[in-house]
Amino acid sequence: MMHAQADKKPDEKLDSRQQIIEAAAQCFMLKGLEKATIDDIADVLGSTKGRVYHHFRSKNAIYFAVHRQAMQFCFDAVGPVLELSIPYSEKLEAMAVAHARVMMDTLPYQRSIRLGVEIYLRGSTTEAERAVLTELINQRNDYEELYRDVLNAGVAEGSLCVPSVKIAGRVMMGALNGLVDWYRVRPEQSDADRDLIATDLARTIVGGMTA
């Protein structure tokens, strides 16, 4: 008789893996990367550690998966904006709105990876894990490059004016990512409330960059 695990369909295995990633994001957000344990993740799932270890060999591996998913949320949110045929100042603001919304909508992921790469770089990691960390840093840099490209295009177009695109990009990402440090989910908060927060933040940032 085959084990039940062997009978699982590919999509069921994917769902199980995704559930672990989501539970880990919650644990990392609440307890921090260094204090959260596999036991904590299993508790959130209401399962045993065995289920977690079936998909991930270590807590580091889970963190890497959380980080990849967090960044994918960002790419998915901003991608459609990049296709819009609008002035680059408007595009930059729309990108900022999309980023701010994804920070709020996927808060456990985004807060759990805040400075996470730097924490792991300071810690004890294997050569293979350091290679993954480099990959994650490159992924983050690729995302930030999307904003620098729009900033450069906006300056060339004349709709944006900044002394340094490099510094403007860092200031912008710092302000947007910093949202996870002060934003708190409230039961009475509506989707429109989140839109307003995202729009106000984006306009505050980009407003100082328009020509």
Q: For each predicted feature, which ranges?
A:
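C-terminal peripheral helix-coil segments that are non-catalytic and often amphipathic
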Residues: M1-D7, A98-V102, N141-A156, M173-A211
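Helix-turn-helix
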Residues: M2, K8, Q19, A23, ...
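Alpha-helical structural segments
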Residues: D15-Q26, L30, V44, A61-L84, ...
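Helix-turn-helix/winged-helix DNA-binding modules
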Residues: L30-L33, H54, E83, N152, ...
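Amphipathic alpha-helical packing segments from all-alpha helical-bundle domains
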Residues: Q72-F75, G123-A156, I167-R170, L196
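Secondary-structure edge/capping motif, primarily at the C-terminal ends of alpha-helices
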Residues: V81, S85, V117-S124, Y183-P187
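Short acidic/histidine-centered micro-motifs embedded in hydrophobic/aromatic stretches
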Residues: M95-A98, L115-I119, V171, A175
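Amphipathic alpha-helical segments used for helix-helix packing
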Residues: D105-A131
